[in-house]
């Protein structure tokens, strides 16, 4: 129901425009059985005068007939619409309710509290911005409270209100001590969850205490009422406006002169003229038009439904994804995810399911189950399978790559569901994890062999023989610095000098590696680590062949640089810091990457939106803003001579 306004009678167009511009907040109520979730929502609507008269009369009549509340009406009947729900006094399915106030529009999902309906609760929470977790003041924090809190955290809901309900009950009597006791108990559990914005409000849902109006029965509470908090909580920063993702739903071809790619923007912003990449083909083009039902736009953002036309004829179809060229998602056929199992039939490791991800559907199987989670204490337990409503971490092996982001970063492109191929039933909901997230799967760095296990150990040609043939010792020189510092220019100049001197040398350029070996990686810290690991392997292989390798890479993490040194061999690994100042790097930026990073269009960009660890003890430091490229190259050559790699 909409907020009543005088504009409805005087200027309906102005009212509709005002209503259209209100921000929408989606929230859920959850908690254990009979904690008062439906009662809370019903009373919230009633006290806000957002209930129709005929609906109120029906609820009052049903309250008298059922006798569910002594001496008054039962607000929960506004939400429990199923006959079984009203007869049993419980919520079975998710009930959605829309209403608005003068400040904001709301969509409420009233979720069931019984354990057997946990899957229904997870469904309601999947699109919520905020969660209200109810706790009965008599019973405190229960197992189902913990279960729902864990799911709320798992599904990335950042804003949580713990509403301690039934403060009016005999034995509680609006006690501040009891409220504080429950808050402390919940906090001790919540410290192990990712709940960054947590608030506590004492309420009586049946009587309306601290819902819309401040309670006279609890003068010791000086915080916000529930409605005031819902109207004012800031959710703007929750939106991902950096990573542009458009899963293609269909190709619109109404005539020979128009070909557009339709879909709902999952995240980010796109503008006319910007370069895009279509996955998985990796073809590039530029946005020609952004077409919508209401006319063409110069820019569009999530969650608008748009049709993009491109400057070039590119082959794309449903299941493909259009992204900004400088910000690619991961494209992988092996992913790790947390699953909420939602089917009566237990999960079967190795069984093939259909994995639905955005507009893409691919067959896949659960390769391994790392552990399941005991929601009562959050301990991880080994298990052969997942039963109904259980939660666990799995590794999925898919028949084709999916283009995804970690769920923590992008709730749309990080979400999957598993479907039974025979019954077509949804059996699980999954949240894709970031590479390297704590779990049973080791970091790929942990699997690295030592330099003693190099290909040289299997070759009939020894390192010494290669050194004698080439007249040099193999080495890798890592030139690290910010984008635009001059790393690659110096590497190419050194290559020329060494080659002209009769040396065998090769350059590993970061952009070259990104187009080949690391084309499936993005630019998160984990992806940069993996990119450097692969580049390190390439450099190590070149060293095994007797070559001097010049690796030009940003390599922002000091920890990862040290790992590369161990991978290659510290006795043949040199670090050159190209210490060109940031302001000079910005001036040299011909691709506009720094400007995009400043505008929030490029995430994890070293020097702007991500940290660059300045090498503390490099073998050489040069400043390409005060020293010419040729002089920098000479310094690198002298370093190689000083270390004995060349004469």
Curated annotation (Swiss-Prot):
Occurrences of domain tr-type G (ranges): 22-239
Chain spans, region Sulfate adenylyltransferase: 1-472
InterPro entries recorded: APS_kinase, CysN_GTP-bd, CysN_II, CysN_NoDQ_III, G_TR_CS, GTP-eEF1A_C, P-loop_NTPase, SO4_adenylTrfase_lsu
List of residues binding GTP: 31-38, 110-114, 165-168
Start and end residues of each stretch annotated as G1: 31-38
G5 as annotated region, ranges: 204-206
Family: In the C-terminal section; belongs to the APS kinase family.
PANTHER family tied to this protein: TRANSLATION FACTOR
Protein name (record): Bifunctional enzyme CysN/CysC
Organism the protein comes from: Rhodopirellula baltica (strain DSM 10527 / NCIMB 13988 / SH1)
């Amino acid at each position: 129901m909409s907020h009543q306004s005088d504009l409805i009678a005087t200027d309906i167009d102005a009212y509709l425009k005002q209503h259209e511009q209100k921000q929408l907040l989606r929230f859920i109520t959850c908690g254990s059985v009979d904690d008062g979730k439906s009662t809370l929502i019903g009373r919230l609507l009633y006290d806000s005068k957002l209930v129709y008269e005929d609906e109120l009369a029906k609820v009052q009549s049903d309250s008298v007939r059922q006798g569910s509340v002594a001496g008054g009406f039962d607000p929960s009947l506004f939400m429990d619409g199923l006959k079984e729900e009203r007869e049993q006094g419980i919520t079975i399915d998710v009930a959605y309710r829309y209403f608005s106030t003068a400040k904001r529009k709301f969509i409420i999902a009233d979720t069931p509290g019984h354990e057997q309906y946990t899957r229904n609760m997870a469904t309601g929470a999947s699109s919520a911005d905020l969660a209200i977790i109810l706790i009965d003041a008599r019973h405190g924090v229960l197992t189902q409270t913990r279960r729902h809190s864990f799911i709320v955290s798992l599904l990335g809901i950042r804003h949580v209100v713990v509403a301690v309900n039934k403060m009016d009950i005999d034995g509680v009597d609006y006690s501040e001590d009891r409220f504080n006791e429950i808050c402390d108990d919940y906090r001790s559990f919540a410290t192990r969850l990712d709940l960054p914005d947590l608030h506590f409000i004492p309420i009586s849902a049946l009587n309306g205490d601290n819902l819309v109006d401040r309670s006279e029965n609890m003068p010791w509470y000086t915080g916000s009422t529930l409605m005031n908090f819902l109207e004012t909580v800031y959710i703007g920063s929750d939106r991902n406006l950096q990573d542009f993702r458009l899963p293609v739903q269909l190709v619109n071809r109404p005539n020979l002169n128009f070909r557009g790619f339709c879909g709902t923007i999952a995240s980010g912003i796109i503008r006319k003229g910007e370069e895009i990449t279509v996955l998985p083909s990796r073809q590039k083009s530029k946005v020609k038009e952004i077409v919508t039902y209401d006319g063409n736009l110069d820019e569009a953002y999530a969650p608008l439904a748009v049709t993009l036309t491109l400057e070039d004829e590119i082959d794309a179809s449903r299941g493909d994804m259009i992204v900004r060229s400088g910000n690619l998602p991961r494209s992988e056929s092996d992913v790790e995810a947390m699953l909420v199992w939602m089917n009566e039939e237990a999960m079967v490791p190795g069984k093939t399911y259909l994995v639905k991800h955005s507009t893409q559907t691919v067959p896949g199987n659960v390769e391994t189950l790392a552990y399941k989670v005991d929601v009562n204490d959050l301990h991880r337990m080994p298990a052969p399978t997942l039963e109904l409503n259980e939660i666990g971490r799995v590794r999925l092996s898919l028949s084709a790559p999916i283009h995804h982001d970690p769920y923590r970063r992008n709730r749309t492109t990080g979400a999957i569901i598993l479907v039974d191929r025979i019954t077509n039933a949804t059996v699980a909901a999954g949240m894709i994890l970031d590479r390297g997230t704590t779990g049973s799967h080791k970091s790929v760095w942990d699997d690295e062999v030592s330099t003693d296990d190099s290909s040289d150990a299997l070759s009939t040609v020894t390192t010494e023989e290669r050194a004698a043939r080439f007249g040099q010792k193999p080495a890798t020189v890592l030139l690290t610095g910010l984008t635009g510092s001059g790393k690659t220019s110096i590497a190419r100049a050194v290559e020329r000098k060494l080659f002209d001197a009769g040396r065998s040398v090769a350059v590993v350029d970061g952009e070259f590696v990104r187009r080949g070996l690391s084309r499936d990686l993005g630019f998160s810290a984990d992806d940069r680590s993996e990119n450097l690991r692969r580049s390190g392997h390439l450099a190590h292989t070149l060293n095994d062949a007797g070559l001097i390798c010049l690796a030009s890479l940003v390599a922002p993490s000091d920890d990862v640089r040290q790992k590369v040194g161990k991978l290659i061999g510290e006795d043949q690994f040199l670090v050159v810091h190209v210490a060109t100042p940031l302001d000079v790097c910005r001036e040299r930026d011909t691709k506009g990457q720094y400007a995009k990073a400043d505008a929030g269009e490029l995430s994890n960009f070293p020097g702007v939106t991500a940290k660059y660890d300045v090498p503390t003890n490099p073998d050489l430091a040069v400043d390409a803003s005060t020293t010419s490229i040729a002089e920098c190259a000479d310094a690198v050559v002298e370093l190689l001579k000083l270390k004995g790699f060349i004469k």
